[in-house]
Amino acid sequence: MIWHVQNENFILDSTRIFMKAFHLLLFHGSFIFPECILIFGLILLLMIDSTSDQKDRPWFYFISSTTLVMSITALLFRWREEPIISFSGNFQTNNFNEIFQFLILLCSTLCIPLSVEYIECTEMAITEFLLFVLTATLGGMFLCGANDLITLFVAPECFSLCSYLLSGYTKRDVRSNEATMKYLLMGGASSSILVHGFSWLYGSSGGEIELQEIVNGLINTQMYNSPGISIALISITVGIGFKLSPAPFHQWTPDVYEGSPTPVVAFLSVTSKVAASASATRIFDIPFYFSSNEWHLLLEILAILSMILGNLIAITQTSMKRMLAYSSIGQIGYVIIGIIVGDSNDGYASMITYMLFYISMNLGTFACIVSFGLRTGTDNIRDYAGLYTKDPFLALSLALCLLSLGGLPPLAGFFGKLHLFWCGWQAGLYFLVSIGLLTSVVSIYYYLKIIKLLMTGRNQEITPHVRNYRRSPLRSNNSIELSMTVCVIASTIPGISMNPILAIAQDTLF
């Protein structure tokens, strides 16, 4: 009898929750239409997986890619609409949020074709992989539009949980298990510190959770200069720092990059930084409006440490993925310059533009690494020696992406860094920009060292896998080559005509 009553209560509670969710989607669904498309794609993938066999695997890639493209299309159709706050203040839709959502969708769209051959060769479970990627993308999109503390905590947790599962996807690999454990433990610790900072904001503002209402609450309670706000600022900086992975919050990055499957690393290396940058700009700029000098100082320290440590340690690496891990730490230091500058001197516009170029440069580099790794089974930098004689297209693509990451003209990375540094210089960040210029020269050194190895190097201890390298055809149906070509083109051409991109980015004020 008791069990029967409990069962009825459970059914009634579940029905109420379902009806409330249906009511929210019915009246607010148009505000999150791109996200609803992703949810529909997730449900469709689950249904097809439960009713089909492994022969339908190509359909999984098609559905995932189509879902992402449709979501991008819906996002573009919504461009330039009036800012809207929906779901009782939990979610905000405006141009600033939408351009970050576009970048996340773009990352995921490019990462799926990059992963196809890797999944086929390693015999990984395809459905779960795509489900995790789409769910992480969904979490990142909700994070970009988050307008209250609860959503700002739940959305990154959705992204992070999928990231942990993806990083440990190759369960038989000891390095992957070690990387996942470190990633999970440090991620959990950082999330607890982040929510601790949120609790101080909540209490200091008189129980407000919406970002703008927190500012009003701090004014009413006269707590905007209190020690509690300083504690909240430090805690939230540490929590967001783990997602952005600047120094000294970068300890997990090299191990996760080296131990995780390469397509997963490609996905995490860009989407996590885009989503974290979107949330960082809103959190620092709105609730901590009265503490701008303090958070500027904190971010300047993080940027300096990231640019110096990231680029110097990258020189000593022998693994390609670990080198890119430390390189990404240096790159996030450049992005932080744009966050510090803010709207005053087009800082956000330059940050968004550089982020777009960074996506193409980084994913192009990882596409080359995936292709080379599948044919050789090695990740060691010395094994790339003389690759130009074996596969000129792959070597040239890798060289262009690395040169663009280093910021050599006339590639996209050069113009992105140039505008970013110029905005920082106009804002008076002379020391920070000088450090950025010097560390960019350091990064060019280790990128050129690899390119020299690609073009002229000869390795006397070359492995049998590299010696028997199978050259890819000039025209290939391989999806990796498709992603690689798109990223290489995007890493070179936009730098010459970047004014339209900057104009769009300048129109994303919130």
Curated annotation (Swiss-Prot):
One of its GO terms (cellular component) is chloroplast thylakoid membrane. The chain crosses the membrane at residues 24-44, 59-79, 99-119, 124-144, 149-169, 183-203, 229-249, 295-315, 323-343, 354-374, 395-415, 418-438. NDH is composed of at least 16 different subunits, 5 of which are encoded in the nucleus. NCBIfam families: NDH_I_N (TIGR01770), PRK02504.1 (NF002701). It comes from Dioscorea elephantipes. Keywords: Chloroplast, Membrane, NAD, NADP, Plastid, Plastoquinone, Quinone, Thylakoid, Translocase, Transmembrane, Transmembrane helix, Transport. It is an enzyme of class 7 (translocase). This is NAD(P)H-quinone oxidoreductase subunit 2 A, chloroplastic.
